[in-house]
């Protein structure tokens, strides 16, 4: 019989995660004078949310949002249901009104890398992200008006243009620390004039 040499499968570390560990972490530690390496801000999770308000009238619309989010994030999103009924919006409790996916670990790093290097530069007339959308604790939320900027989405197969909200949660204590981290990761912020 022949012996097969079993080599352990090498795990590919995301490019942005490697860059963070090798250069960004040390730069931030020097900039903010942290005494402990664990005080350096890092990414915790990225939440991608797609609200589909018209799904109250047509329940098939939620399927398109789920399909688009699955292609963009690489994982199946959670369907968001209405918490309470609102008669003016013809909304019943439990109706699907959106979808969201929470990315952590390597999927999060890959998504942020694709977002910064591929998706954001494809936006027409893009001038940069606003630096005023931090929440006071170093977390950043911004909205995108359409999903076609992601190269995973086939423009011929989309049923309608949908926007999305993306929240980047960090361990930063202040907005300045969060901004420095995201800028180092490649987020294109507008230069405030």
UniProtKB/Swiss-Prot annotation:
Coiled coil ranges: none
Keywords: Ribonucleoprotein, Ribosomal protein, RNA-binding, rRNA-binding, tRNA-binding
Record-level Gene Ontology MF annotations: rRNA binding; structural constituent of ribosome; tRNA binding
Matching Pfam families: Ribosomal_L5, Ribosomal_L5_C
InterPro entries assigned: Ribosomal_uL5 (IPR002132), Ribosomal_uL5_bac-type (IPR020930), Ribosomal_uL5_C (IPR031309), Ribosomal_uL5_dom_sf (IPR022803), Ribosomal_uL5_N (IPR031310)
GO cellular component term of the entry, any: ribosome
GO biological process: translation
Source organism, top-level taxon: Bacteria
NCBIfam families from the UniProt entry: PRK00010.1
Record text on subunit structure and interactions: Part of the 50S ribosomal subunit; part of the 5S rRNA/L5/L18/L25 subcomplex. Contacts the 5S rRNA and the P site tRNA. Forms a bridge to the 30S subunit in the 70S ribosome.
Family assignment from sequence similarity: Belongs to the universal ribosomal protein uL5 family.
The protein's role, per its UniProt record: This is one of the proteins that bind and probably mediate the attachment of the 5S RNA into the large ribosomal subunit, where it forms part of the central protuberance. In the 70S ribosome it contacts protein S13 of the 30S subunit (bridge B1b), connecting the 2 subunits; this bridge is implicated in subunit movement. Contacts the P site tRNA; the 5S rRNA and some of its associated proteins might help stabilize positioning of ribosome-bound tRNAs.
Protein name: Large ribosomal subunit protein uL5
Organism (species): Pseudarthrobacter chlorophenolicus (strain ATCC 700700 / DSM 12829 / CIP 107037 / JCM 12360 / KCTC 9906 / NCIMB 13794 / A6) (Arthrobacter chlorophenolicus)
Underlying gene: rplE
